[in-house]
């Protein structure tokens, strides 16, 4: 049989996976979940097997972006492989696996992953890389593919935001920057503010994430929005697990039974203050009660400063080229106004004679890396950068790290 190609974008919140010839990946939570009745669910099983998400507890294999628990991850991967191949059998012995992992992953954790790939599952060939390095490939075939030699990727996910320069299809590691603010930090801040101002929702992770996704946005001008905050007021109807299991935003056309026990949240400045943490990290300092968080114990710059630092740390001749091809990906970039705000701030900070272009991919922002990985498998270069199972057992586990690990050039 001919070789198959399987791509996994192994995010700390969602997994995107599938054969490279699929039209789109399957996407589900990278977690085990436990309901109040004690039942354990894998991935998105809880969405179809229960209609009460209240008090759901999630156990994720990632901590601060690092894959630390293969005991959890293997159960999720088994679920993924079963979901991804209902019509096409996954035979690892003839399958090439493209897998993403966080930049600057600890070498021992990467070696654990390599061991699972080759020794547990027995994949035939393997390529491991940072998610951002696949993003330029996702634009191949588009009218802008000619610009892919110099790309700066802003990947804002669940555990943090990475700014990664890609030069001639290689990560320029000296320029990589990280802002430790991502979806998890936004959810935590939203949880504490709502619990203080309205209802205690500390044990409602599904509800918190739903409120963020349906109501929050990035303000173009934070000070102006704050001064006119009342016009951004919206009412979020909380789930009663009879008429709605997730809750929804009330509109003029929303029919609501006013005689029932309807509970709602009136959200005003929370809608844009939470995402503003990307530009004013002090918002988190002022509103969080955690004393163990990385964010609490470390000072860091905002996203604009880090993008500028990233560009300036790259070779001088590439700097204006990178500023003209900035791509935003990751779940947080689904926030309305995220890309426009970043463009607005960078124009003020970068040289006036540079062209500044910040754009989104043609795909769903949190699926861009998967589509890039699928496109990469169609290029002959995949044969030069992959490691076979034979190479792994012949040279040992360090061989993968030499090939795939980050380079301090």
Swiss-Prot record:
Answer whether the UniProt record assigns the keyword Cytoplasm to this protein: yes
Keyword annotations:
Activator, Chromatin regulator, Cytoplasm, Cytoskeleton, Nucleus, Transcription, Transcription regulation
Subcellular localization: Cytoplasm; Cytoplasm, Cytoskeleton; Nucleus
| CDD domains for this protein | ASKHA_NBD_Arp6 (cd10210)
Mind telling me which InterPro entries this protein's record contains?
A: Actin, ATPase_NBD
A GO BP term here is:
chromatin remodeling
Q: Which GO terms describe its cellular component?
A: cytoplasm; cytoskeleton; Swr1 complex
Per its database record, what is this protein's job? Component of the SWR1 complex which mediates the ATP-dependent exchange of histone H2A for the H2A variant HZT1 leading to transcriptional regulation of selected genes by chromatin remodeling. Involved in chromosome stability.
Q: Which family would the database say this protein is a member of?
A: Belongs to the actin family. ARP6 subfamily.
Q: How does it assemble?
A: Component of the SWR1 chromatin remodeling complex.
What name appears for this protein in its UniProt entry? Actin-like protein ARP6
Gene of this entry: ARP6
